[in-house]
Amino acid sequence: MNETQLENLCLDWFLENGWEVVHGIDIAPDSSNPLRKDYKQILIEADLQAGFERLNPHLPVSCFEQVLQKLNQPESLDLVTNNRAFHRMLLEGVPVTYKKQDDWVHDHAFLVDFNHVHQNRFVAVNQFTILGTKQPRRPDIICFINGIPFAVLELKSPTDENADIWDAFNQLQTYKEEISDLFVFNEALVVSDGVTARVGSLTANQERFLPWRTIKNEDDKPALEWELETVIRGFFDRELFLDYIRFFVLFETDGEKTIKKIAGYHQFHAVREAVQATIAAANPNGDKKAGVVWHTQGSGKSISMCCYAGKLLQQPAMHNPTLLIVTDRNDLDGQLFETFSNAQELLKQTPVQANNRDELRKFLAERESGGIIFTTVQKFALLEGESEHPLLNGRHNIVVMSDEAHRSQYGLKAKLGNDGTYKFGYAKHMRDALKNAAFIGFTGTPISSEDKDTRAVFGDYVSIYDIQDAV
């Protein structure tokens, strides 16, 4: 099979998955039905305008020019900075202004409808020629939603012994240099020779290009002959792909450098399962045990926790919940806090850290909705003279996210102390303080079968990704 045959097979899979397929040559500037003014144009403006009018009936049509200008004229010379700015507009809407009678109105135009798949137009285009800084370039397949290119697939022939997926990876690096405007809007890159396929972010190196092994959920792992088919049926499932670009993309600043991180398949499905389990557990009639996510160490637990928080905060069923993130040690608290602080596009709020017991109690007692609060488990210790922890907040939409829950003295049962008084573990104090909160645990090590305390607080596993899965 040569590269053209693989490309056609790939387009067939997109078609079967509900995407429209268009050949780049048929919409080129010099075709009989041009959808581009010239070969430098990246956006399919007719689709973008149709999407704008469909998704923004509250705005005058004149606002479309403002949207087009903001998308076509990024503010920075740095690609990743522009990509981050676009991602923020994608989630929050593009700022527009218009005159209504005598007043100027400030509003937002939305580019994608994340809640209604059928309100969007999904098009896979092959051989879309773009005039680069040195020569014309033709990525194999570009995935457009409402005229915006969200993903690029670069393919190599499975039978060519002199080419492999890393040649495709190198080709993408060249494209980023020569046709960088295409990547301002990018949310995923795929390299494949059909048999092997890897998915990575705009800034990912080879090591961070990872397989995508699932289709509908984490148990749906068909042993397909072509890994590329799994990527197209799973990662590019239209509903899942929208969820992905909305809740599973993070930016981290490391000194001067911005890194874009996207979730792996195990993180994506674990978070989706955990959010559903939490909604059920947090219900006034729920058991308040949202479960335990066990993902082997080194598999990106902090990203999973951050994406879970971002998705949970936006669930209408949670009525703007408060999240309390509990760690066992100060250094963990700091690391995780940094990841969350970097993710404000996703979380839409700034997390706070409780520095002592009094501050923690104040944060929790005053909160009527929303908020992300970090603390260590030790701050639930009793004050002098207290025999039990006072109730701080009785709301049902508080979720306690625990990092490495089972490391601490999480006991619910009383133990007789040396001074003849009964002492409870922190879990009992947390439960007393937040009597209607739901609890979820994230861990990199399995819970022992004898550990009944952890299960009593959190319930059973909601997702497992162990060493075997990670290989």
What are these regions (language model features)?
Residues N330, P351-R361, V377-L382:
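Conserved helicase motor
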Residues I325, I373-T375, V400:
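Hydrophobic positions in the central parallel beta-sheet of the AAA+
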Residues I165, S201, L210-P211, Q378-E388, ...:
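Signature of the SF2 helicase/ATPase Hel1-core->accessory helical subdomain module
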Residues D26-I27, V352, G444:
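Proline- and acidic/polar-enriched loop/turn elements at helix boundaries
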Residues S192-D193, T327, S402, T443:
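Short beta-strand/turn micro-motifs composed of small residues
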